[in-house]
């Protein structure tokens, strides 16, 4: 799968499911939303008051799962790196109405932005047995 196909899959399927290891050591899954891509990095955001933030700090290895209308799905795993660049935070705030309503400003101290490093992708087709693995 090519990097532009991966990016389009994220954009075309706005709800992704993020899997973490909970504070109790058990898996946790919740809906998330891809924010933007910059220099080959996939960016997401959260609030540092949420449990998911603490879970990621405790174990930065996560996996996203995204399914399209054809029931094909993309698994994306990697290591979370928190980004402090105000330029990225500003782009996210300016491009997402809901995020702007929640955080008001890119310098809100609870607004956290992260990207994935050591990223692996696995495309799975309902009609096929094989997985296609790739990197961005």
How should these model regions be labeled?
Residues 17, 42-43, 122:
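General beta-strand recognition
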């Amino acid at each position: 799968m090519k990097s532009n196909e991966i990016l389009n899959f994220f954009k075309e399927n706005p709800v992704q499911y993020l899997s973490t290891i909970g504070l109790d050591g058990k898996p946790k899954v919740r809906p998330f939303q891809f924010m933007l891509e910059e220099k080959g990095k996939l960016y997401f955001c959260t609030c540092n008051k949420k449990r998911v933030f603490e879970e990621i700090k405790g174990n930065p290895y996560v996996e996203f799962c995204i399914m399209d209308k054809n029931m094909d799905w993309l698994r994306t795993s990697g290591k979370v790196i928190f980004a402090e660049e105000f330029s990225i935070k500003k782009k996210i705030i300016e491009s997402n109405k809901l995020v702007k309503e929640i955080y008001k400003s890119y310098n809100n101290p609870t607004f956290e932005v992260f990207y994935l490093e050591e990223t692996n992708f696995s495309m799975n087709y309902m009609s096929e047995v094989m997985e296609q693995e790739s990197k961005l």
